[in-house]
Amino acid sequence: NSWENNKNIIFSGSLIWVFLLIIVGFLNYLVV
């Protein structure tokens, strides 16, 4: 059960990083 919780935390964390990368890339696209 703890492994399932850790997997969910890692998955949600990676989703947040992907979202941040998309925002940064979009801002760079707007600036350029």
From Swiss-Prot:
Stated name of the protein: Photosystem II reaction center protein Z
Membrane topology field: Single-pass membrane protein
- Pfam families referenced in this protein's UniProt entry, alphabetically: Ycf9 (PF01737)
Q: What is its main location?
A: plastid
Q: Where in the cell is it found?
A: Plastid, Chloroplast thylakoid membrane
- Functional description taken from the UniProt entry: May control the interaction of photosystem II (PSII) cores with the light-harvesting antenna, regulates electron flow through the 2 photosystem reaction centers. PSII is a light-driven water plastoquinone oxidoreductase, using light energy to abstract electrons from H(2)O, generating a proton gradient subsequently used for ATP formation.
Key word Magnesium present = no
Name the residues that span the membrane. Answer: 9-29
Looking up InterPro entries in the UniProt record yields:
PSII_PsbZ, PSII_PsbZ_sf
Cite the record's note on assembly: PSII is composed of 1 copy each of membrane proteins PsbA, PsbB, PsbC, PsbD, PsbE, PsbF, PsbH, PsbI, PsbJ, PsbK, PsbL, PsbM, PsbT, PsbY, PsbZ, Psb30/Ycf12, at least 3 peripheral proteins of the oxygen-evolving complex and a large number of cofactors. It forms dimeric complexes.
Q: Which species?
A: Euglena myxocylindracea
Q: Name one GO cellular component term.
A: photosystem II reaction center
What's a BP term from Gene Ontology annotated to this protein? photosynthesis
- Which protein family is named in the record? Belongs to the PsbZ family.
Q: What is the lineage of its organism?
A: Eukaryota, Discoba, Euglenozoa, Euglenida, Spirocuta
Please provide the record's keywords in A-Z order: Chloroplast, Membrane, Photosynthesis, Photosystem II, Plastid, Reaction center, Thylakoid, Transmembrane, Transmembrane helix
**Keyword field contains Transmembrane:** yes
